Structure formats: structure tokens, C-alpha cells
């Protein structure tokens, strides 16, 4: 009865009790549960939607709700992910068996990345893969995607695959000209099928630009992931109230560190410098390591337009040769950037570190600094690795040597604590002044980069520990333990492909199965294969089997770093979580009890959004790199369509074989091309980690992808002459 139903969870239970007995329409359910009144009606509909989104009930084509029984229905439900080749996949675990359902682009039926979908027409293979098609979209992730306007009210999808189009309100079309790229929110319900095209209603959120605009491709990627260069007018208005230099009244209550030898170390082109460092060695051999971070929270009042926009963006996005900042440049490159030769407001973490690398004590306080020099990684590496001293660095060499000493000690300490070092397979694009890709280089972490990373980790750890024991609201950076099954699956792949020795893998698998392993074991395993030619593949497979780090309002430790306490404190110019950490540092001095209680309530949602926007920025950065690779290989193809490239297979699935060329470009071989290789007797050569030789088959700029054909003639040779 309705009087017994007190909240939405009770309503859900009552719905499940009813559909357990028989299938019911929404009206029959409403009647059976005595749903009356607007409030009860709204809660009832919300409960129905939540149950359907979680895959607990199923709404059939006749309008009946029933319990979602995968075996009985012959359907499964899950979150769809769509790769750049147009194929979708859904991971579902049922009765202890995890299956990857593969959906051809012809059977996506309008599904977009991250949507919750129901799959039908399932055909299981011999492995844990199955083919399926999307029956319906239960919930849109956000429904936003890019279309290109072709006139007369018609749109074509620009970046998504499949036969999909949208119909937008006429009043929204008035602002458009043919060739406009627009960000459209697509409804989940298909309204028609016309000439094999799924038609959806849509609403234009933003005109991104015109297809002929410079940098339109990068603007398109950014818009897809929620990043825009323009700031709202109210943000621009607030900027006018923020000073461009430190004022005398700003110094009140701050420790004056302007007489210390403090400096920054960043990339050569970095303009938003939010961290500076200094160090002293004590007479008894200890170190006082100081990390000074731009005090952005001093200038950005909570809930002001600048703060609201930063919260919305979550992070800065670095897209090839351009940056979409979290704050306007007047903030990120100006008053909050720790530029050389000017006073800046900071939050400082002083750490007393033992000769063995243990942080014995720390202090966190507001300060003012005056950076002595803007250093860059290349110059500092010249000093520390080659003993070459660039002009202007002479007076800083003794300090840099002490810092190097401290960094090496911290590296060893982190190793003992279980920090897992993965091989970086990151690639950076080197561009011309106009943004044209010139080459692709692997990112390397040298002495200077490692030094800054170690110092920032030390500061982040100290701040996290401080707040954990203070027991006040805070944002933490957490990384959970790996899923044992996923890790074992990755190890079995390495064994099957004969990339690693069977004995070494079996030892680790047995430890995992017996529950007797930790991050030290994983670290030892990776170190063991560090000189293996396929170490990047080994490292990548292990890394992708692990969960991603995220933000959370509770301190749960960081598995990958082997740390009990961790947060992000050191980049408040470009990361919203760091700004929140700054705000919540020393909260008992600044906030009353009601405010603290409010943070306890709001932090979970803030952490979830910040984690989401971090993933969006990462994906936008990856897609931008893919775009530059596609543009580069398009030029290569136009110059010489018969050029042969050497590379290595880095990933294989039934729907895709991924190859990384020696020039660091990543491309793909389709299943049909692999089938052809098998037919002519070359299948035994095609394994994970194998060297292969390819020609460019096709390049798609909208989908940011390069397709290869295997060069069978070269595959059969023992010695290959590869064109440079």
C-alpha cells in the first residue's frame, strides 16, 4: 500500500515485487501500487527509470515491464563504448562469466559513446566474445555529438559512425550556414527510419565553427568533450576586478619567503607555472624540501563566475599545440603563474626529510615568494646528466645537485613502498608554427622530470596525511587495487602470445589466486622485463587491466604509487580538484560548522564530476594526437602511396589489429586484411609483439584513424629494406 512506501528505495522494491509475478504496463503498475498525487507520481517514474537503467527491469515493445532475465529474454544490457573504427563493444558479467559483446557499426542503431543499451540477436563464439546488435537505448550518456549542416535542414554525422541523422527545430536553423559544425544533443528515442537512416530529434547546443575554419578539427574534438576556448561574459567581467600584481594588503598573515632561492622547472613553452621549489640541507644530513604552489584560491572567490566556470571545466585540456585553459590567461599565465622576477602568493609545504627519504615532519602555510628563475627541463637535464651548464644557471648548480640527491633518495623510497613504474607509451607531436605535425616522439622522463614528480608526490602525500588525521572534508586522489580476474587475464595473454616466460607469469598468477601479492610483486614483475623488446606491450597490458585513478571525498590510498595517503594539491591553475584541496586546507581557521557539513554533502558530486572531466580531457588529448597522426599520414600517402613502413603489433582483438610504426604513428589493420594474410599462409607471423611491414590503405580525418594493408611480400623476407 502507498502508506507503507516511504522513499524511492521502497518504491523500487514494490515495483520489483510486482513485476516478479507478471508483466505489467505502467498504468497497471501504478494501479497495483496505489500511486496518487504529484509527488508520489514523480517518485514512481524516477524509480521506474532507475530500475530500467540498472538493468533490473525491461520495457518491451508492447509497453510491458518485466524482470530483466538475460537468459529468458535473450538480451543483455550494459554501457557501450565505440572505437574509432566504428565498432561498439559492451562488457557484461553474467553467472561469473565476463563476455565482451561486439557490435558492428551497422547495428549501433544510433547509440553513442557511453550510452546504456540493450543488446539483442546475440551470437556467442568459442571465446569470451559475442556478436550482437543494439535493440534500444535505455539512457544517453550525455547525447552530445558533432554534426555538419549541409543545408535545407539536413545534417550528416561528422565524427560518429552509422546511418544516423537528426531533425532540429526550425528556429535553431536560422543561425546556420551550410558547412557549419554544430554540437547537437540527440534524444534517445528514434522517431523514424528513412532510407536506412535512424532519425532522432536533436537540439543545437553550440555552433563550433565552419568546416573551412583553421583548427576546426581541434575545436570539434574539444567541443565533443565539453571544452570551449571562449569564456562567459560574466567571467570576463570578474576578471576586471582581479589585480595583475600582488598588493600590499595581500601579504597580511603570510610568511615572507622572498629572500629564498626559489625557482620553477617546466617545459620550455610552459606559461602556466603553478609550482616552484627550494631546498636546504641541515648540518645533521637531513633535508628541508619546500614546495610552493600558486594560491589560486586567494583570487577565486567560491561560487563566483570564475569558480563556477572552473568547476564546470574541471581541468585544462592540452590539445597538440593549443591549450584550452580552466582559467582565462589573465589568471593562468598572469597573476597566478609563478613567473620569474615577480612576487606571487603561494601555499607552501615544508617537509623535513631524513637521509633515507622518510618525511619526518611537515608544515603547510600561506606564503609569498619571488621566483629567481624560470628553468626548463632540457637545461636542467644538461646540468644533471651531462654536467653542461647553460648560461644563467651558474648560481643554481649547487642547489640543483642537492635536489638531484634528494630526488634519488625519494625514488628509492617510493620503490620500497611499492610504487609501480609503467613504461610510458605516451607520444607527443612536434608541430610547425602553423600546427602541422612534423614528427611524433616518445615521451621520456629524464632526471629533471623525475625530480619534479618526486617533489610533487611528496607534497601531495603530506597534505593528504594532514587532512586524513585532521578528519575534515577533503578531496583525495585514490587508486584501487587491481581486479584479480582482469590482471590474470592480461598475464594469460602475455603467456599465450609467448611474450613473457611461462614460469615467471605462473608465479605471479599463483600469488594473485592465493591472495598473497601486492604492488611490490607487480613492480618486481615489470622490473624483471624492463629490458625486453616488448616491455612497452607488457607494461601496457598490465596497466589497462587496472582501474583508473579518480577523485573521492574519502582517503582510500593509491595502489599505483604504493601510498596510504594521497591527494592532488600541486596544480590549482589547471585542475579543479587541486583548487578544492587548497580551499579546504586549514578549514577550521576559515569555515564554520554548517559550511563544513555542506562540504561533506557536496564533495561526492564534485569529485565525480572532476573525475569525469579528467577522463574527457584525456580522451580529447588522445583524439587530437590521433588527428595529427591521420593528417601526417594523409600527407605521406599523397607524397608516396607505395611507401612501406615497419612497425610492431601492439594490440589484437577480433575486430582490430593495432600497429605502432617505428615513427610512433599508430594505425589499424581490418579483420578482412588479416583474413587475407591467413589465406596466403602468413597468419603464423601475426602475433602480439611481432614486427610487421605495412602500406597505407586509407586515412579518415573525421574519425582520426589510419588503416594499413599488410605488405605480404616484405613479410616473407628475412631482411627488409624499409623506405625512410
What role is predicted for each listed range?
Residues 2-290, 297-343, 374, 381-382, ...:
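Charge-lined substrate channels and their catalytic hotspots, especially those that engage the 3′ end
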Residues 31-34, 189-193, 214, 220, ...:
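Electropositive polyanion-binding surfaces
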Amino acid at each position: 500500500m502507498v502508506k507503507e512506501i516511504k522513499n524511492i528505495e521502497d518504491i523500487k522494491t514494490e515495483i520489483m515485487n510486482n513485476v516478479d509475478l507478471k508483466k505489467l504496463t505502467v498504468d497497471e503498475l501504478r494501479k497495483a501500487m496505489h500511486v496518487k498525487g504529484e509527488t508520489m507520481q514523480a517518485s514512481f517514474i524516477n524509480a521506474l527509470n532507475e530500475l530500467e537503467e540498472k538493468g533490473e527491469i525491461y520495457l518491451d515493445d508492447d509497453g510491458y515491464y518485466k524482470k530483466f532475465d538475460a537468459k529468458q529474454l535473450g538480451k543483455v544490457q550494459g554501457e557501450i563504448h565505440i572505437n574509432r573504427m566504428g565498432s561498439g563493444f559492451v562488457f557484461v558479467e553474467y553467472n561469473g562469466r565476463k563476455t565482451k559483446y561486439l557490435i558492428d557499426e551497422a547495428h549501433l542503431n544510433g547509440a553513442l559513446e557511453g550510452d546504456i543499451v540493450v543488446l539483442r540477436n546475440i551470437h556467442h563464439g568459442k571465446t569470451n566474445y559475442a556478436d550482437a546488435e543494439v535493440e534500444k537505448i535505455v539512457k544517453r550518456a550525455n547525447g552530445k555529438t558533432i554534426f555538419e549542416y549541409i543545408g535545407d535542414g539536413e545534417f550528416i554525422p561528422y565524427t560518429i559512425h552509422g546511418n544516423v541523422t537528426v531533425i532540429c527545430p526550425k528556429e535553431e536553423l536560422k543561425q546556420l550556414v551550410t558547412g557549419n559544425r554544430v554540437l547537437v544533443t540527440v534524444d534517445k528515442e528514434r522517431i523514424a527510419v528513412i532510407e536506412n537512416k535512424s532519425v532522432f530529434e536533436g537540439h543545437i547546443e553550440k555552433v563550433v565553427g565552419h568546416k573551412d575554419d583553421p583548427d576546426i578539427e581541434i575545436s570539434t574534438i574539444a567541443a565533443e568533450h565539453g571544452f570551449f576556448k571562449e569564456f562567459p561574459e560574466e567571467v570576463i567581467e570578474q576578471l576586471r576586478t582581479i589585480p595583475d600584481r600582488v598588493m600590499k594588503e595581500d601579504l597580511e598573515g603570510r610568511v615572507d619567503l622572498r629572500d629564498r632561492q626559489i625557482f620553477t622547472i617546466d617545459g620550455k613553452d610552459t606559461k602556466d607555472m603553478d609550482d616552484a621549489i627550494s631546498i636546504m640541507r641541515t648540518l645533521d644530513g637531513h633535508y628541508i624540501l619546500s614546495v610552493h604552489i600558486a594560491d589560486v584560491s586567494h583570487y577565486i572567490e567560491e561560487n563566483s563566475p570564475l569558480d563556477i566556470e572552473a568547476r564546470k571545466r574541471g581541468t585544462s585540456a592540452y590539445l597538440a599545440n593549443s591549450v584550452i585553459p580552466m582559467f582565462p590567461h589573465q589568471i593562468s599565465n598572469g597573476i597566478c603563474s609563478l613567473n620569474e622576477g615577480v612576487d606571487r602568493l603561494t601555499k607552501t609545504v615544508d617537509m623535513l626529510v631524513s637521509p633515507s627519504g622518510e618525511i619526518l615532519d611537515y608544515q603547510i602555510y600561506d606564503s609569498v615568494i619571488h621566483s629567481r628563475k624560470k628553468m626548463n627541463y632540457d637545461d636542467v637535464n644538461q646540468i644533471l646528466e651531462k654536467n653542461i651548464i647553460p648560461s644563467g644557471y651558474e648560481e643554481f648548480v649547487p642547489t640543483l645537485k642537492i635536489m638531484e640527491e634528494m630526488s634519488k633518495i625519494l625514488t628509492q623510497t617510493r620503490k620500497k613502498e611499492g610504487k609501480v613504474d609503467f613504461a610510458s607509451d605516451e607520444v607527443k607531436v612536434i608541430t610547425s608554427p602553423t600546427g602541422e605535425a612534423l614528427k611524433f616522439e616518445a615521451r621520456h622522463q629524464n632526471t629533471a622530470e623525475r625530480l619534479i614528480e618526486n617533489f610533487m608526490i611528496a607534497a601531495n602525500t603530506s597534505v593528504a596525511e594532514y587532512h586524513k588525521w585532521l578528519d575534515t572534508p577533503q578531496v583525495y586522489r585514490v587508486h584501487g587495487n587491481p581486479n584479480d580476474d582482469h590482471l590474470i587475464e592480461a598475464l594469460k595473454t602475455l603467456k599465450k602470445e609467448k611474450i613473457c616466460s611461462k614460469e615467471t607469469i605462473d608465479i605471479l598468477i599463483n600469488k594473485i589466486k592465493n591472495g598473497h601479492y601486492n604492488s611490490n610483486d607487480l613492480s618486481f614483475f615489470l622490473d624483471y622485463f624492463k629490458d625486453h623488446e616488448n616491455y612497452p606491450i607488457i607494461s601496457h597490458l598490465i596497466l589497462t587491466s587496472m582501474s583508473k585513478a579518480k577523485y573521492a571525498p574519502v582517503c582510500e590510498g593509491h595502489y599505483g604509487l604504493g601510498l596510504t595517503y594521497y591527494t592532488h594539491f600541486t596544480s590549482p591553475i589547471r585542475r579543479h580538484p587541486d583548487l578544492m584541496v587548497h580551499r579546504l586546507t586549514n578549514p577550521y581557521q576559515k569555515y564554520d560548522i554548517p559550511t563544513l557539513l555542506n562540504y561533506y554533502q557536496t564533495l561526492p558530486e564534485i569529485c565525480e564530476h572532476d573525475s569525469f572531466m579528467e577522463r574527457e580531457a584525456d580522451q580529447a588529448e588522445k583524439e587530437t594526437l590521433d588527428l595529427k597522426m591521420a593528417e601526417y599520414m594523409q600527407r605521406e600517402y599523397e607524397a608516396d602511396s607505395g611507401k612501406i613502413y615497419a612497425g610492431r603489433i601492439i594490440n589484437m582483438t577480433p575486430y582490430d589489429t593495432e600497429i605502432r610504426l617505428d615513427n610512433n604513428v599508430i594505425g589499424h589493420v581490418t579483420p578482412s586484411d588479416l583474413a587475407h594474410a591467413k589465406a596466403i599462409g602468413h597468419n603464423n607471423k601475426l602475433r602480439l609483439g611481432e614486427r610487421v611491414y605495412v602500406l597505407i590503405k586509407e586515412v579518415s580525418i573525421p574519425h582520426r584513424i589510419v588503416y594499413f594493408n599488410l605488405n605480404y611480400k616484405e613479410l616473407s623476407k628475412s631482411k627488409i629494406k624499409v623506405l625512410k
